[in-house]
Structure formats: C-alpha cells, structure tokens
C-alpha cells in the first residue's frame, strides 16, 4: 500500500543537524514504491547522512536533530518524528552497508537472527523463511549444502548477498543500501546490481552510490545532492541525459566530483 500517487516515503523540508552543523537543508522529494531511487553527489554532500535519516541511525549519536517530515505510507507516520520509536522504524526499513558485515555465526543463523528476534521459533518456519531469503538474494544454490558453516567462509560478494538476505528475511517495506558494491570486484558487483533490480518487485529501494554508471544502470529515479542540498530529482534517464541544473550536468559529465 502506498499513497494515491504511488509514493512510499514523502520527504518534505527535511533538515538535519549534527550538533551545530547543519548537514541537510530543506530536502524535499518523493520515494516511489517498488522503484529504485539512487542518491548521487560528491563526497561529503550528505548522501549517506540522508539515507541514515530514514531508519534513524543518527539517533545513536548525541546531538543529532531532525526537522521536517519523512512520511511513510500507508499509515502516514513521520519516520523522523520525535514520538516515533526508532526501533519500530528499523523493523520496517532494512539496511545494507558499504562493507559486508555478517555476524560471527553460521550462514543459517545470520539469516534467522532477525526472524528469531521477532518471535519466530518454529524450525520449519525458520527453515522456510531462511531458504526464501537466500533464494531472493541469489545465494541459495551456492550455500544450500553449507548452511551451518561460518559466514566468514564466504567470499566478499557472497557475504554481501548474505547481508542482503538477512535484511530481506524480515520483509522490510524499504531497503536502504549504502554503496553496497564499493568493496567488491566487478563480477560480484554485477551480481549485486542484477539482484537489486530483481528485489524492487518486492521492496522499495534507496541506494547511495559514488558510481554514476551504477546509478544509471539500476535506478528508476535519481536525487543529486551537493553540500547538504538536493539540487535536482527526477527520472534517472532525464537526470543523466537532460538535467535541468548546470550543477547536475557538471557533476554527471565529470567536471567535478
């Protein structure tokens, strides 16, 4: 379920401060359901800061302050509202980080961990959901005979797909991805990109990437940020071929970055 306009998260006048530092300034854009939205921009522009607002990661640090709205549909809760429990937000919005970060547990236990936290204890149900998540993460065929081996025995690309399986096992409504392929080789990167495109059938995805070719390949919409401000947002094809702002064009054509 979304709003009438197919929006999953409606971001309006979002501002964010680290202490006295005004990191994000009046950010407004829609995140469309079952689409991939890429956030691009030079280092330090606020991409990851914005991404981490959506699941309240900043709440872990003292002095973090939000203003504005990030309305999650269908129930229209403000994800950054002071009265909204960040733990409940994180149950609905999953995250995959830059470097693979599997738990020091078996492959199976990595995927089952979140399910158990949510009270699922029956082995047959856990088995079914673990297999489904690993299949959805395009990893099942590679690990089905070694589920009880340590996750660290997997390659880097496999570990990242395991982290994706772990995130999607609990069926989040939105999946945040912070440069999910930056630590991977080109073959592993291609597998993850194919996987991301496949996953959007089931989950809304927001991806931060330094790799503009990646943004062009996988995303439906692109947000270009510069110095804490959203410069331009629109369909990816338009942003990359006919941007409205000169700053966007300069960044995309490599004049700065």
From Swiss-Prot:
Residues annotated as binding ATP: 41-48
Record-level GO cellular component terms: plasma membrane
InterPro entries reported for this sequence: AAA+_ATPase, ABC_transporter-like_ATP-bd, ABC_transporter-like_CS, P-loop_NTPase, PstB-like
Subcellular location(s) per record: Cell inner membrane
UniProtKB keywords: ATP-binding, Cell inner membrane, Cell membrane, Membrane, Nucleotide-binding, Phosphate transport, Translocase, Transport
Keyword Ion transport: no
Cysteine pairings via disulfide bonds: none
Top EC class, one word: translocase
GO BP terms, alphabetized: phosphate ion transmembrane transport
Topology of this chain in the membrane: Peripheral membrane protein
E.C. designation(s): 7.3.2.1
PROSITE patterns hit by this protein: ABC_TRANSPORTER_1, ABC_TRANSPORTER_2, PSTB
Keyword Cell membrane: yes
Domain ABC transporter: start-end pairs: 9-252
Pfam families: ABC_tran
GO molecular function, one term: ATP binding
Catalytic activity: phosphate(out) + ATP + H2O = ADP + 2 phosphate(in) + H(+)
Record-linked SUPFAM superfamilies: P-loop containing nucleoside triphosphate hydrolases
Binding partners and assembly: The complex is composed of two ATP-binding proteins (PstB), two transmembrane proteins (PstC and PstA) and a solute-binding protein (PstS).
Protein family per UniProt: Belongs to the ABC transporter superfamily. Phosphate importer (TC 3.A.1.7) family.
The protein's role, per its UniProt record: Part of the ABC transporter complex PstSACB involved in phosphate import. Responsible for energy coupling to the transport system.
Protein name: Phosphate import ATP-binding protein PstB
Organism the protein comes from: Aquifex aeolicus (strain VF5)
Lineage: Bacteria, Pseudomonadati, Aquificota, Aquificia, Aquificales
């Amino acid at each position: 379920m979304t709003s009438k306009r197919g929006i999953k998260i409606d971001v309006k006048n979002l501002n964010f401060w680290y202490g006295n530092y005004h990191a994000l300034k009046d950010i407004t854009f829609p995140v469309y359901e079952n689409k991939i939205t890429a956030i691009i921009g030079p280092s330090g522009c606020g991409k990851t800061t914005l991404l981490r607002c959506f699941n309240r990661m900043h709440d872990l640090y003292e002095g973090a302050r939000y203003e504005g709205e990030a309305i999650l549909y269908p129930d229209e809760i403000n994800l950054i509202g002071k009265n909204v429990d960040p733990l409940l937000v994180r149950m609905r919005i999953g995250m995959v980080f830059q470097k693979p970060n599997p738990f020091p547990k078996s492959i199976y236990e990595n995927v089952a961990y979140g399910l158990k936290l949510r009270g699922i204890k029956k082995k047959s149900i856990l088995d079914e959901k673990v297999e489904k998540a690993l299949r959805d993460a395009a990893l099942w065929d590679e690990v089905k005979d070694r589920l009880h081996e340590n996750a660290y025995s997997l390659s880097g690309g496999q570990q990242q797909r395991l982290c994706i399986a772990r995130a999607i096992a609990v069926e989040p409504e939105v999946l945040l991805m912070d440069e999910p392929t930056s630590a991977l080789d080109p073959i592993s990167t291609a597998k993850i990109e194919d996987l991301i495109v496949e996953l959007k059938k089931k989950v809304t995805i927001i991806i931060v990437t330094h790799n503009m070719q990646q943004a062009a390949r996988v995303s439906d919409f692109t947000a270009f940020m510069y110095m804490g401000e959203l410069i331009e947002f629109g369909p990816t094809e338009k942003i990359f071929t006919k941007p409205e702002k000169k700053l966007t064009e300069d960044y995309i054509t490599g004049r700065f970055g």
